Amino acid sequence: MNALTAVHNNAVDSGQDYSGFTLIPSAQSPRLLELTFTEQTTKQFLEQVAEWPVQALEYKSFLRFRVGKILDDLCANQLQPLLLKTLLNRAEGALLINAVGIDDVAQADEMVKLATAVAHLIGRSNFDAMSGQYYARFVVKNVDNSDSYLRQPHRVMELHNDGTYVEEITDYVLMMKIDEQNMQGGNSLLLHLDDWEHLDHYFRHPLARRPMRFAAPPSKNVSKDVFHPVFDVDQQGRPVMRYIDQFVQPKDFEEGVWLSELSDAIETSKGILSVPVPVGKFLLINNLFWLHGRDRFTPHPDLRRELMRQRGYFAYATHHYQTHQ
């Protein structure tokens, strides 16, 4: 089996006219598409969901699907199939999404509503133990004393998959920029598995399918360890990953050395994309075959970035891990 997959255009022509949004290839890669909601769509969406504060979406989970339907209806029901087609397409699987008119931290609640609507057109966002909600908001500042690299600004946050230390399947990851002050650097880093030049070597290694222990630090509010291999396959036999260097716990010398070499091979890949994400925009990626991370920031005493994330499962597909769910 050849683990590399050629890049093909989306079955829906990226030059096609859509109702309520536009779609173009990104400057970084044809695998990453940029979807922009028009000013009119954004305005109508916010007007129609204004009656529900974010707290209502937190307390009544069915409302998350309601706001998704409102957004899809405003896009002539072209949005949901486009999202699913793109995210389930192995040759793509990633979107940078923007809504004209949403670009300021004062609109943070509107950002949460928009991201929630998009996410719940493809599936459902899982409970986030770190925040106690279906989403998490967190801040990166110039000085950090936390117990993981999530908020540390002056180093690269290495490429990884989300959901490695929980039992729930994590098919997608959504990462939104809510605020940014005195920032230079800190671009999102992305790597598609099929663009990783060392994939075949590590996917075929005897340790690739050995269950390993993943344990989270206290800030994640997850006390139970989980066991799964770093690599698995989807229903078509293609490689997928569940990996993060911070939380995998090698049991012996052999595993430790292999994981260290794996980490180096990922971080030095020539296939890594550097993607700026302005305030109000968000990345939505297939977590099974995209790794994500963050570049370092330039130090500044008043540095501040606020992010929002959602992670969940696809409700319209069965592209899950085949052997260790």
Curated annotation (Swiss-Prot):
Reactions this protein catalyses: glutarate + 2-oxoglutarate + O2 = (S)-2-hydroxyglutarate + succinate + CO2
Domain of life of the organism encoding this protein: Bacteria
Recorded GO MF terms: ferrous iron binding; glutarate dioxygenase activity; oxidoreductase activity, acting on paired donors, with incorporation or reduction of molecular oxygen, with 2-oxoglutarate as one donor, and the other dehydrogenated
Species assigned in the record: Escherichia coli (strain 55989 / EAEC)
General function of this protein: Acts as an alpha-ketoglutarate-dependent dioxygenase catalyzing hydroxylation of glutarate (GA) to L-2-hydroxyglutarate (L2HG). Functions in a L-lysine degradation pathway that proceeds via cadaverine, glutarate and L-2-hydroxyglutarate.
Organism placement in taxonomy: Bacteria, Pseudomonadati, Pseudomonadota, Gammaproteobacteria, Enterobacterales
Protein name, per record: Glutarate 2-hydroxylase
Required cofactor(s): Fe(2+)
Keyword Iron: yes
Gene3D superfamilies: Clavaminate synthase-like
Binding, Fe cation: H160, D162, H292
Gene name for this UniProt entry: glaH
